[in-house]
């Protein structure tokens, strides 16, 4: 063996050239690249969910401040007083204060408590409207948050709400059954409709690896066109109506009103709170929830521990869809009992994504975030009626909240909050989950 060759007869590899490439490693490079991108996506989602409550609070404050800037810019008196800003600056700043304070005061009175009400019913009506509007947001937000914690981006809550409302509404206006039985079957039908619709994305993800974001977005469009077609059929269309409207929901299938006929608040709100408690127990105390968290923390480690990732994916999507379907039941069986329309879901499915992010995908946080967004919706109507502020400002504030929640470092930089160091709670929880799975 010469000094220029190895014992096997090959030329030595220069140290600066690094190790020789291995064909097997080259073939695995695309797979590793795909896994790296998936890991980055999961890491971003964890950072969003792990922003602490201080960051969340300041994100809302920042969004409200920017909303105040837009309110001032949209006010006619502010624009008029800007013409003599240097001559009378106090008039300009006074106009800004009156516009912003008046708008947010009206927003509060329309969402929480109206001190100018003539009686108790008028005073507490705003908070009951907030709870009514927040009900579908809480249901759908719980489903989306459950998917987030399991590593799935379920963007299809809008379509799942529609399918839940379709099936629940069909049972509600077609069959004549005893009171309790009819309501239970209609609500279960709504949950089943949402679960089946979400399971399509889950099965495609589990069997073919299809991206659940794209599939659920496409299913949203399919659901929108599907309900439009169904309302043109004899089975769904109200007899004698020229509009795409179904028959009214029978009294036996409606959610009972909690405070009497003068308020719209119904039993669905209490069911949403019970659903939040159920999701908490599922994710924190059950074996199935442990599997969900393990797959969300590290699918490869979960697979090594013997957990069926495809089966878990289908289960997660089905449960998330059933919760979104219950959001549809809250609409058709509780709030909009006059009949099924193609706008029954409004934009609750899309707003629920923000609710889940703001609530950090936790049940308690989701309930609070749902109430916040319900209050913005309820108060925005009075804000526009009393001050003339465009109700679109509310949508802009919601968008700013999404922006700041999705960028915790930006919020920390704006308000000079200390940066977090060490292991995050997500990493600690992932390590704990891995230990539990290994045990």
Where are the language model's segments positioned?
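Single transmembrane alpha-helix segments in multi-pass membrane proteins
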Residues: 70-72, 76, 101-175, 187, ...
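Cytosolic-side transmembrane-helix boundaries in multi-pass membrane proteins
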Residues: 2-63, 68-76, 277, 304-312, ...
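Helix-loop-helix "hairpin" substructures at the membrane interface of multi-pass membrane proteins
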Residues: 196, 262-338, 363-368, 438-439
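Transmembrane helix-bundle core of multi-pass membrane transporters
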Residues: 106, 110, 216, 220-285, ...
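Alpha-helical transmembrane segments of multi-pass membrane proteins, especially transporters
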Residues: 52-56, 129, 133, 156-165, ...
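Hydrophobic core segments of alpha-helical transmembrane domains in multi-pass membrane transport
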Residues: 56-72, 137-144, 165-171, 191-194, ...
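Transmembrane alpha-helical segments in multi-pass inner-membrane proteins
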Residues: 318-324, 332-399
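Interfacial/capping segments of alpha-helical transmembrane domains
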Residues: 66-112, 235-245
């Amino acid at each position: 063996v010469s000094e220029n060759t190895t014992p096997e007869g090959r030329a030595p590899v220069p140290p600066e050239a690094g190790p020789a490439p291995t064909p097997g490693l080259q073939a695995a490079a695309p797979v590793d690249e795909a896994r790296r991108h998936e890991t980055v996506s999961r890491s971003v989602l964890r950072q969003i969910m792990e922003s602490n409550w201080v960051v969340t609070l300041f994100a809302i404050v920042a969004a409200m401040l920017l909303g105040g800037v837009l309110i001032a810019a949209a006010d006619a008196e502010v624009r008029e007083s800007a013409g003599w800003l240097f001559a009378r600056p106090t008039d300009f700043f006074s106009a800004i204060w009156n516009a912003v304070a008046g708008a947010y005061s009206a927003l509060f009175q329309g969402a929480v408590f109206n001190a100018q009400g003539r009686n108790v019913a008028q005073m507490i009506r705003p908070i009951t409207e907030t709870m009514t509007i927040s009900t579908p947001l809480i249901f759908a937000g719980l489903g989306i948050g459950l998917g987030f914690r399991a590593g799935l981006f379920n963007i299809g809550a809008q379509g799942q709400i529609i399918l839940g409302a379709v099936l629940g509404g069909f049972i509600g206006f077609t069959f004549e059954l005893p009171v309790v039985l009819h309501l239970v079957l209609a609500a279960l039908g709504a949950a089943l409709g949402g679960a089946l619709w979400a399971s399509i994305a889950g099965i495609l993800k589990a069997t073919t690896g299809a991206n659940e974001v794209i599939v659920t977005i496409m299913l949203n469009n399919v659901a929108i066109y599907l309900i439009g077609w169904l309302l043109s059929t004899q089975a769904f269309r109200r007899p004698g109506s020229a509009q795409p409207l179904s028959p009214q929901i029978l009294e036996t299938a409606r959610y009972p009103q909690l405070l009497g006929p003068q308020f719209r608040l119904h039993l669905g709100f209490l069911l949403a709170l019970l659903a939040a408690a159920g999701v908490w127990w599922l994710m924190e105390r059950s074996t199935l929830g442990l599997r969900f968290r393990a797959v969300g923390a590290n699918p490869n480690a979960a697979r090594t521990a013997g957990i069926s990732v495809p089966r878990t994916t289908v289960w997660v999507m089905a449960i998330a869809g059933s919760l979104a379907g219950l959001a549809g039941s809250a609409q058709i069986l509780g709030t909009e009992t006059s009949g099924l329309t193609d706008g029954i879901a409004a934009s609750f499915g899309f707003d629920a994504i923000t609710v889940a992010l703001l609530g950090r995908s936790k049940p308690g946080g989701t309930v609070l975030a749902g109430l916040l967004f319900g209050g913005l919706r309820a108060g925005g109507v009075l804000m526009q009626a009393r001050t003339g502020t465009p109700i679109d400002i509310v949508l802009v504030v919601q968008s700013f909240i999404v922006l700041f929640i999705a960028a915790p470092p930006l919020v920390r930089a704006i308000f000079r909050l200390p940066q977090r160091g060490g292991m995050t709670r997500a990493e600690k929880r992932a390590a704990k989950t891995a230990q539990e799975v290994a045990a």
